[in-house]
UniProtKB/Swiss-Prot annotation:
GO terms for cellular component: cytoplasm. Catalyzes the adenosylmethionine-dependent methylation of the exocyclic amino group (N(2)) of guanosine at position 10 of various tRNAs. Acts via a two-step process that leads to the formation of either N(2)-monomethyl (m(2)G) or N(2)-dimethylguanosine (m(2)(2)G). Its EC number is 2.1.1.213. The keyword RNA-binding applies. The lineage of its organism: Archaea, Methanobacteriati, Methanobacteriota, Methanomada group, Methanococci. This is Probable tRNA (guanine(10)-N2)-dimethyltransferase. It is found in: Cytoplasm. Its main location: cytoplasm. GO terms for molecular function: tRNA (guanine(10)-N2)-dimethyltransferase activity; tRNA binding. Disulfide bonds: none annotated. The keyword Disulfide bond does not apply.
Length: 162
């Protein structure tokens, strides 16, 4: 349910390109595939990448895949360059809690770099355990109470310039 909600918040339409740079087992990519989106995903963990591919196959969504690959989200530009993709239409992701140990750079730096590969008027939608301020325009933020020691913040940022 949360995956569908976040993908819907990205305002993508059929045929658009969705990027999830922390794809895990592919929940956002699966929802994107159901919506007819083209899918690009990466994760730093081989097992997660393999799980994403298996899950997309089990839902018969492999025809939507542009690329799913092991890659560090802190260097997403070079990943997209290999695909001859300069910009994506939208980004939906949920970085791991231990982000500082699993991706180079801090989370703000990584997300601002993601903004560089986002098309003008595209949306970056993500969940995190704290409020995160970026160079993009914050359109919406939602607090999702999980339990007494965990609240998730759903951020919806828009790229308003190139």
């Amino acid at each position: 349910k949360l995956a569908m909600c976040l993908v819907n918040l990205s305002r993508l339409k059929k045929g658009d390109v969705l990027l999830d740079p922390f794809c895990g087992t592919g929940g956002f990519l699966i929802e994107g595939g159901f919506m007819g989106l083209k899918l690009i995903g990466s994760d730093i963990d081989d097992d997660m990448v393999n799980g994403t591919l298996l899950n997309l196959k089990s839902y018969n969504l492999t025809e939507h895949i542009i690329s799913i690959k092991k890659w560090n989200a802190g260097d997403i530009k070079s990943f997209l360059k290999q695909l001859n993709v300069k910009y994506v239409d939208g980004i939906v992701t949920d970085p791991p809690y231990g982000i500082s140990t699993s991706a180079k750079g801090n989370i703000e730096e990584i997300f601002n770099n993601l903004g560089d590969v986002l098309k003008k008027d595209g949306y970056l939608v993500f969940a995190s355990s704290r409020k995160i301020n970026l160079d993009l325009e914050l359109m919406e933020m939602y607090e999702l109470y999980i339990h007494k020691s965990l609240t998730r913040y759903i951020h919806v940022y828009k790229k308003t310039d190139n």
